[in-house]
């Protein structure tokens, strides 16, 4: 029987964290780990806790969660930041079913924040939708958002974990690009999510003032260094990553499907 693991990332937002975990149906998940990258909370955490002694950043925090879940020999891995709320706990099986049908080994929830929504609305704005058999459909979005992510065991085995260099920016973009290069995800700028994912997940009411990363005093410097590292690593600036036409994207999806 397949084993599902969930890693929850939190940083100095006890109220968010409490609401986040309150929405989780433990019967849907085999292993849960919490990584607290900030000061300890003054209440008990009901799951295995990795408490950092100092702020290590989101890249290392996500890796710590994934390493713990790998030690438990999970087959499917989910990472969730503390400002994501579960609306329907069938979300886990929906991502797994989509992976099994399409062959795509990695998905990111697209509807966190505003980047993949129609301007001024909460309506998803995918570049296209692809329909498969067995009532599975996926949406492909322009922007890669890393607040809720799915990986298979195969994906992590072949692509490795996140680059520890990234502190509070770009870690998910770099990792997803690595997975794309392994041909387990559609091309860059066509980021995969299950169709209608906003029926299963939602954001905690968000604004720049509630984002611990957006409020960082050296946010611009962190982003600049992350883009510089990405450029050295991949040979081009992140914004120069090729944006393939839809017909080529569909051919890539066919190849991923054949290799599942």
Protein language model regions, located:
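Short, well-formed alpha-helical segments that are part of the catalytic scaffolds
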Residues: 13-26
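A conserved acidic beta->alpha catalytic loop
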Residues: 34-44, 85
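Glycine-rich, basic loop-to-helix element that forms the pyrophosphate-binding segment
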Residues: 53-69
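Short beta-strand-to-loop acidic/aromatic patch adjacent to the donor-nucleotide binding site
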Residues: 74-85
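Conserved donor-nucleotide/metal-binding helix-loop-beta segment in metal-dependent transferases, i.e.
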Residues: 90-106
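Short beta-strand-to-loop element that shapes/binds the nucleotide-sugar donor at the catalytic cleft/hinge
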Residues: 107-122
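A recurrent flexible, glycine/aromatic-enriched loop bordering the glycosyltransferase active site
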Residues: 131-151
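C-terminal catalytic/acceptor-binding lobe
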Residues: 165-260
């Amino acid at each position: 029987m397949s084993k599902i693991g969930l890693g929850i990332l939190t940083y100095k937002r006890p109220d968010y964290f409490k609401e986040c975990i309150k929405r989780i149906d433990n019967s849907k998940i085999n292993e849960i780990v919490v990584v607290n990258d900030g000061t300890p909370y003054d209440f008990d955490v009901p799951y295995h806790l990795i408490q950092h002694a100092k702020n290590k950043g989101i890249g290392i925090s996500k890796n710590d969660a994934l390493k713990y879940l790998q030690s438990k020999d999970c087959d499917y891995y989910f990472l969730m930041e503390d400002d994501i709320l579960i609306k329907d706990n069938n979300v886990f099986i929906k991502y797994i079913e989509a992976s099994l049908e399409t062959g795509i080994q990695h998905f990111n929830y697209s509807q966190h924040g505003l980047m993949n929504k129609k301007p001024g609305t909460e309506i998803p704005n995918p570049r296209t939708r692809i329909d498969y058999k067995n009532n599975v459909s996926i949406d492909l979005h322009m922007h890669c958002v890393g607040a809720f992510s799915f990986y298979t065991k195969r994906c992590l085995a072949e692509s490795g974990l996140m680059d520890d260099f990234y502190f509070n920016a770009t870690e998910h973009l770099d990792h997803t690009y690595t997975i794309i290069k392994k041909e387990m995800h559609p091309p860059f700028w066509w980021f995969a999510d299950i169709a209608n994912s906003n029926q299963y997940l939602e954001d905690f009411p968000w604004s720049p003032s509630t984002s611990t990363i957006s409020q960082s005093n050296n946010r611009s410097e962190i982003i600049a260094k992350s883009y510089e590292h990405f450029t050295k690593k991949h040979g081009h600036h992140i914004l120069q990553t090729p944006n393939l036409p839809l017909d080529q994207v569909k051919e890539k999806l066919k190849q991923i499907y054949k290799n599942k």
